[in-house]
Amino acid sequence: MPWIQLKLNTTGANAEDLSDALMEAGSVSITFQDTHDTPVFEPLPGETRLWGDTDVIGLFDAETDMKAVVAQLEQHPLLGAGFAHKIEQLEDKDWEREWMDNFHPMRFGERLWICPSWRDVPDENAVNVMLDPGLAFGTGTHPTTSLCLQWLDGLDLNGKTVIDFGCGSGILAIAALKLGAAKAIGIDIDPQAIQASRDNAQRNGVSERLELYLPQDQPESMKADVVVANILAGPLRELAPLISVLPVSGGLLGLSGILASQAESVCEAYADLFALDPVVEKEEWCRITGRKN
């Protein structure tokens, strides 16, 4: 069905209040967008980090009386009569189908392909990971995921144990298993990610070699030959004491989800325990790898 979109411009400090006002006026969903396309880094736990100049966008059913919506919003103390706004009709699309149509098989390194589960594989002799990300992050399209997949493809994983810290869709853990790892362990704070990883592991025939845990359930003695963590710079710094103990002595560590401008601070958090390689960059993002001393 078609939708109507109403956009307001405000400050980050007022965005939450106007979001509530739009919901009270009948909006079925709210989106925050940066007016000037400025990067916003990860928030602290419990914090909603917003830009200084923020667009608040409400989505309304096509049958909504938008004149009545505007009249209601004019009563809000942050808006008032004649407040600036933009209303537009959105084209009726099958958004899920459009997304699926634009998700194509992708090659990473020499051996590895990530293929949507609804498409044919381009090379049956390659290492093919069939993926349906569901509600969890991780398709290989983001530079950080790509950097991690290329790194895994270049390793000799035969017989190794791999930990995917922040596993999302399970893409890295499953790729490691398909590349020869004997066992993979996925950890994520989101139960939906655990379920998506479980479904994708079953789709790829590696369920019996993949263990999945929420952080509070993971074994204390857990160790691996290779540890990969594609999360964000802040958590990578804060969790460095926890992540650093996961690789065995001489084990490998791969970190991403890091902007190139954040690489130095992340490297500092791991430099005491790891011999770090040169940082690899891709599209303003980077990957940090090293071997445990």
From Swiss-Prot:
It is found in: Cytoplasm. GO terms for cellular component: cytosol. S-adenosyl-L-methionine binds at residues 145, 166, 188, 230. Keywords: Cytoplasm, Methyltransferase, S-adenosyl-L-methionine, Transferase. It catalyses: L-lysyl-[protein] + 3 S-adenosyl-L-methionine = N(6),N(6),N(6)-trimethyl-L-lysyl-[protein] + 3 S-adenosyl-L-homocysteine + 3 H(+). CDD domains: AdoMet_MTases (cd02440). GO terms for molecular function: protein-lysine N-methyltransferase activity. Its main location: cytoplasm. InterPro entries: Ribosomal_L11_MeTrfase_PrmA, Ribosomal_PrmA_MeTrfase, SAM-dependent_MTases_sf. Its EC number is 2.1.1.-. It is an enzyme of class 2 (transferase). One of its GO terms (biological process) is methylation. Methylates ribosomal protein L11. HAMAP family: Methyltr_PrmA. Belongs to the methyltransferase superfamily. PrmA family. This is Ribosomal protein L11 methyltransferase. It comes from Klebsiella pneumoniae subsp. pneumoniae (strain ATCC 700721 / MGH 78578).
